[in-house]
Design a protein with these regions (language model features):
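Thiamine diphosphate
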Residues: 1-134
């Protein structure tokens, strides 16, 4: 209990995507289909955090992209930032999620695009991070 599941990991990977729920499968499929050197982590437990894994990502100097389709405030990314702050580590972190604003009504696809939490936005950030290591 409290251990997250890691997919497509390799010591030469410099980018990790942390997410949860059904999006993990879609993210992993896109990573594999595009042969991206990206680790995908299913953060299936918010509490407790998998601190051992988070410490390992920081020790490996990985860019960490936290992808959640919920509010950023009080979510997975907030918990991870708090943990890193507590251990005084500052890894490269990008958070993708819903900002603290009013969200209009519409289809899930439309709202994800409107809030920039769709997979295209995520993978634009992934490619941006990978280019830093070329």
């Amino acid at each position: 209990i409290g251990k997250w599941t890691t997919f497509n990991d390799s010591l030469d990977h410099k980018v990790a995507i942390l997410s949860y729920g059904p999006d993990v499968d879609r993210i992993l499929q896109k990573v594999m289909n595009n042969n991206l050197k990206v680790t995908v982590i299913n953060c299936r437990f918010l509490k407790p955090l998998d601190k051992e894994l988070l410490k390992d990502l920081a020790d490996r100097n990985m860019s960490i992209i936290i992808y959640e389709t919920d509010m950023l405030a009080g979510g997975l990314g907030s918990e991870i930032l708090e943990y890193y702050n507590d251990i005084q580590v500052k890894p490269d972190i990008i958070r993708i999620g819903i900002k603290d604003n009013y969200v209009p009504q519409g289809s899930i696809k439309l709202l994800r695009e409107y809030e920039h939490i769709d997979l295209n936005t995520l993978f634009d950030k992934v490619i941006e991070q990978l280019k830093k290591y070329d």
